[in-house]
Amino acid sequence: MENDAGESVDLYCPRKCSASNRIIHAKDHASVQLNIVDVDPETGRMTVGSKTYAICGEIRRMGESDDCIVRLAKKDGLITKAF
């Protein structure tokens, strides 16, 4: 599709599940997206860094979303490996 300036634009950009790498379809209303921000330990305010995780409805239906989020957060260094 093109806009008024003649540039090609997409109406829908599909997301991928962070845990299973599946494409999250537009009709997957059970999927969630979590934005976890970095917090300054002294002031308690949000800094510029953040991490986004998208979990598809299939993972949530199986009850594995909490394990997947912990695994992804460990991999990104948000929580300790001994958690």
Swiss-Prot record:
GO CC terms of this entry: cytosol; ribonucleoprotein complex; ribosome; rough endoplasmic reticulum
Key words of the record: Cytoplasm, Endoplasmic reticulum, Ribonucleoprotein, Ribosomal protein
Localization annotation: Cytoplasm, Cytosol; Cytoplasm; Rough endoplasmic reticulum
Transmembrane helix is among the record's keywords: no
Domain of life: Eukaryota
GO molecular function (one): structural constituent of ribosome
BP term (GO), one: translation
Subunit description: Component of the 40S small ribosomal subunit. Interacts with sta.
Family: Belongs to the eukaryotic ribosomal protein eS21 family.
Protein name: Small ribosomal subunit protein eS21
